[in-house]
């Protein structure tokens, strides 16, 4: 069942490509996706192409997927091993933070929420203590260089680890479709949550139509 849901979502994303992320699927396991997230414009992460893996549990969509960065990240809410601390994907204190997982969530919404998190860290719920301390010093104007320097280092490293094809993909996507401004990611996520689409399976629909036609022919006879 889970693979049927994911196939429908995958098909939706392929038919509606985004300039903000790129997805690919493990042909042998539909529950494992590779994604590349483009750093939001007008932020320290601008220009970066950050790789991550998305793993879907057997209970999906009734349980959230797990996203883990494989690119090195410097961010208060991303663990050193790449695991992500975000309420939309984890149940811990989700209600207090105002966001809970819902089966109506779409992969688009999840990925845009992660991109939004890059520009809006929550240092009060740190996954990387050192990054959180550095970010607080930046916010308090105690150290204006350390945090930006580390982020820019990871941006450069992410590009070094990307293939020319991936870089070209985003270059073409950005030139063809205007990027979402950094302060609009949250609004975009909210709109997408309201605009849920119905998962359909063409083959099954066609089979049902054929069966109905056969029944009608038998009744006529």
Swiss-Prot record:
PROSITE patterns per record: UBC_1, UBC_2
Residues annotated as the enzyme's active site: 85
EC number: 2.3.2.23
Cofactor binding, per record: Binds Mn2+ ion which is required for highest activity. Can also utilize Mg2+ ions.
UniProt-listed Gene3D superfamilies: Ubiquitin Conjugating Enzyme
Subunit structure: Interacts with host 40S ribosomal protein RPS23. Interacts with host translation initiation factor EIF4E. Interacts with host E3 ubiquitin ligase CUL4B. Interacts with host RNF138.
Protein name per UniProt: Ubiquitin-conjugating enzyme E2
Organism encoding this protein: African swine fever virus (isolate Warthog/Namibia/Wart80/1980) (ASFV)
């Amino acid at each position: 069942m889970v693979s049927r849901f994911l196939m429908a979502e995958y098909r939706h994303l392929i038919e509606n490509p985004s300039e903000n992320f790129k997805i690919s699927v493990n042909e042998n396991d539909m529950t494992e996706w590779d994604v590349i997230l483009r750093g939001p414009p007008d932020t320290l992460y601008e220009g970066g192409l950050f790789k991550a893996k998305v793993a879907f549990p057997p209970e999906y969509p009734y349980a959230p997927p797990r996203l883990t960065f494989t690119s090195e990240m410097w961010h208060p809410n991303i663990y050193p091993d790449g695991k992500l601390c975000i309420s939309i994907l984890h149940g811990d204190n989700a209600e207090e933070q105002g966001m809970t997982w819902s089966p109506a969530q779409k992969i688009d919404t999840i990925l845009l929420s992660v991109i939004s998190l890059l520009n809006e860290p929550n240092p009060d719920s740190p996954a990387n203590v050192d990054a959180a301390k550095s970010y607080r010093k930046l916010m308090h104007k105690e150290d204006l260089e350390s945090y930006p320097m580390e982020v820019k280092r990871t941006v450069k490293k992410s590009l070094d680890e990307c293939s020319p094809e991936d870089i070209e993909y985003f270059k073409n996507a950005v030139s063809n479709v205007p990027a979402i401004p950094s302060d609009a990611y949250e609004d975009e996520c909210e709109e997408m949550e309201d605009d849920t689409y119905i998962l359909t399976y063409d083959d099954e629909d066609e089979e049902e139509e054929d069966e109905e036609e056969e029944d009608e022919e038998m009744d006529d006879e």
